[in-house]
Amino acid sequence: MINNAARSLLCEQFIANNTIDPKLYDRYVVKRGLRNSDGTGVMAGLTNICNVHGYVVNEGEKSPIQGQLIFRGYNINDLVSNAQKENRFGYEEIVYLLLMGDLPNREELTAFKGMMAENRPLPDNFFEDMILKAPSKNIMNKMARAILALYSYDDNPENRSPEYEMATAISIISKLPNIMVSAYQVKKRCYDGESLFMHPLIPTHSTAEMILSALRPDRQFTEEEAKILDLLLMLHAEHGGGNNSTFACRVLTSSGTDPYSAYSAAIGSLKGPRHGGANLKVAAMHQCIKDNVQNWEDEGEIADFLTKILNKEAFDHTGLVYGMGHAVYTLSDPRAVILRENAKKMAENTEFEREYKLLEAVERLTPELFKKIKGSDKAMCANVDMYSGFVYSMLGIPEDLYTPMFAVSRMAGWCAHRFEELVTGKRIIRPAYKAVSVEKKYIPLDER
């Protein structure tokens, strides 16, 4: 172990030699974060899988519009509303759509659900060897390690045939919820001192039902609870090729590596607080607001505290209202709109109704306060994180699983993008970095 003094000295040297003058980025016209100056993403590829539409550009000017999320040509609003109209679970249909490119008929969907049920169980001794014997405080870390470990249980993991890739994708999508719940139960036992319980899987369960059944000691849940969790899985399943985790998956895929490595990297990306981990920031901020606003129905008091947050005087002092704003969406995030409507219905006449109204007030008040305090006319809307954590809390799902739930859902999108990259990519993704270091003459060791 490095002592504190040595560590501090090394860190000073590390920081000094790894800092680049910000002016150089402008001089060499570097698109930092692969973003254009107006915040839009640099065009790095083409995709048939998903369209995330939040603005239009007219004569070089970015104009805000109502957001649209389209999976394989189908609007997310239509996919959700039809599943609800027919009173059935929709996530498995979304998975099929993303992987295969079109909607299944009844027979195809039934067969596909059967494939997912068959693939949910973990390999023999996997739970004991890979999860129970090596617990992790962070479930995302454990999920990434578990996906990598599945490579060793595969008879032919370097096979790149379409048949193998499809079978592996269905296997991983099906197993990941089981891995998540298993890792969480072990974490509770090893780090929280709670009892460990593992329920046998029920083959007829949907993905949402399987998760709720596995998490609860008595296995009991209502249809309303399972349907709103299914809705969350649908909304998080895919979001274009440019988001960090999907791009990471495509970057690794372009190198020719195996699917386990590519999907594990995507989980590692989603774990980051600037990406999937942002939902934990939203939950923490909401708790801070609840603790500091005495009257949740007083919009003036709510606005005063939001002003403190925006002025970097409260919460984490970053000046950010988490859950508000998005890199693409401007006037609305369709996922947030759908989730807000369903969260409202679920919260009505329950202990959660007051909290829902508080979140609604935060969403309504923040854009004008942001404009007033920051002096910006930038369009701002609530993103899906504004209400996802709230719905998870109504379901009794712990914060430890907020981002892992995101990963469970998004695995379908990652798999679809890997397929597309394998079929159409044909070259390794390799952007350029300009060296700005100064040439130095080597100094012999004794003369330094």
Residue ranges and their predicted role:
Residues 1-448:
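Non-transmembrane, aqueous-exposed alpha-helical and coiled segments at domain scale
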